[in-house]
Amino acid sequence: MKKSQKRISNVSEIKAQLKTVETKVHNGVFLFSGIMTIAELAQKINVSVNQIITYFFHQAKMYNLNHSLSEDEIAEICLEFGLDFKKEVQIDASNFMEEVSILDQDKDLSPRPPIITVMGHVDHGKTTLLDYIRKTNIAKNEKGGITQHTGAYQVVFQGHIINFIDTPGHEAFTQMRARGAKVTDIIVLVVAADDGVMPQTKEAINHAAAANVPIIVFVNKMDKPNKDVDRIKNELSALNIVTEEWGGSNIFVYGSALTGQGIDTLFSSILLLAEILELKANKNRYPIGTVIEAKLHHNKGTIATLMVQNGTLMVRDFIVAGYQYGRIRSLENTNGQPIKFAPPGTPVIVTGLNYVPEAGDKFFGFHEEKFAKQLALEKKQSEKISKTKVQTKQQTKEKTLNIIVKADVAGIAQALHSTIEKLASKQVHIHILHSGVGIVNKADILLAQTSNSIIYAFNLQIPAAIKAQAKQAQVEIREHTIIYKIVDEIKKQVRGMREIRYELQQIGTAKIIAKFWFSKVGSIAGCSVLSGKFVENCKIELWRNSKLIHSGKIESLQRDKNPVKEVQVGNEFGTHIYKFNDIEIGDELKAFLDVEIEE
């Protein structure tokens, strides 16, 4: 990038989208940003408070004017009173990294290098493959090799750059996804030709599916005499990873990480898929990307590896990552060589930050320190509020029980998987993210943390270190040795999660035949039951001349000055209506009870 060439500012993009949503009716559409009270909603849509309260009363919901309505309830009221509705996202410092859309014009976009993560079962050759690729790149680099672990590196194949994120495995991949980072474009799944699909292979596939990342399969160890390629294809097809040879959409590459067989084919396949994915970015803007890793060096201070995904990062740029900001002092490529700038699709080692960002933090680059500082400060101040909003939002989503199943033998794991899926109800969906054989491991904990899952471990000993990690990550591991106890436990969870629905059923009618006034209580209605019955604390409607006057509940129920629990047809009783005194002789009372509706 030329020094004189100006970059598009992220400041203008963000400022343009930072907004406070004005709650109002516009062209028959009610615009709102979140929950509000009945009184607030009534005022905004020009409907009386009583109309809204009565609407919810008929749904067995006893609300007052200060009750806060959920987004779904606001939508219900809008539809009830003939309005369309639209929720608009309010964007501020607490959520701008997630909500701000950076839209570049097509003419400004150009292809960027793909970003690859290699995953696979232990001992299937993931590390050997990465080592071979890394050494190949070092050999081509005349200025020397990589002297430190940077978390990411680049290779050049036929003039095209490919990025590899070098992580310890599924754990790091999941940690990034847990923090909302979408950094990987393609996953290369390594499967040993002489071993087949193993537990961590399934884990990797589940991780990829959860992150919606396409998979290229590298069938490794093709130099082994006991390889069985058909077995690999069959086992992977059962997991919805189907080779193109069989009409599927997954590219399979056959080779050996030890000898280098198939590596060039793998590179070609990556570039082909990257072309299909149309990975593009605008190099002429300030940078946006993800923190790959960071550490504190005793001499250099913070050293961080960043993946630039859009825009160009330069020395002296200010960046906001997490809820802090800093200024870039130096840039190095992953070979440790100084560079002047890092375009899109470039892993870069930076110094100058006065804090250590976390892996998976998204970062934005700016030329204005004032704006970066303001955003970081506001984001920090809103962190606790933001967490509360997330929890509230999660509670209002469709109810899903996420589960991970681990067992000592495959047959039990399969049986549990099948049995648990059948325990879902109409209101509560059960999603089994992963089921497998063997002890609960770090990858299980991280997947559970990411997806808010419960881990069920059948007939397994959980290592103390794993229990400690689960506790720290606030992940539940439930250990069992009897299947029906797992079933009973999940049934209780499903019952506890479902929204209890009630139907308001009319149980009786009465006529007010006398009224009295007591200064300590208010109006007392003397009533005669015309049909059905009245019960203690039942809900009522008061009607006068065929017009609904009041919806509420009775506060007491007495016969001959003695409190009673119910009064049957043909009998008389006295009652006081809660916080309501405007009664007249001849008024009709209708009694209602909430009845729970079974699914």
Curated annotation (Swiss-Prot):
GO terms for molecular function: GTP binding; GTPase activity; translation initiation factor activity. Residues 120-127 are annotated as: G1. Residues 145-149 are annotated as: G2. It comes from the Bacteria. Residues 166-169 are annotated as: G3. Pfam families: EF-G_D2, GTP_EFTU, IF-2, IF2_N. Keywords: Cytoplasm, GTP-binding, Initiation factor, Nucleotide-binding, Protein biosynthesis. Its main location: cytoplasm. PANTHER family: TR-TYPE G DOMAIN-CONTAINING PROTEIN (PTHR43381:SF5), TRANSLATION INITIATION FACTOR IF-2-RELATED (PTHR43381). One of the essential components for the initiation of protein synthesis. Protects formylmethionyl-tRNA from spontaneous hydrolysis and promotes its binding to the 30S ribosomal subunits. Also involved in the hydrolysis of GTP during the formation of the 70S ribosomal complex. This is Translation initiation factor IF-2. It comes from Mesomycoplasma hyopneumoniae (strain 7448). The gene is infB.
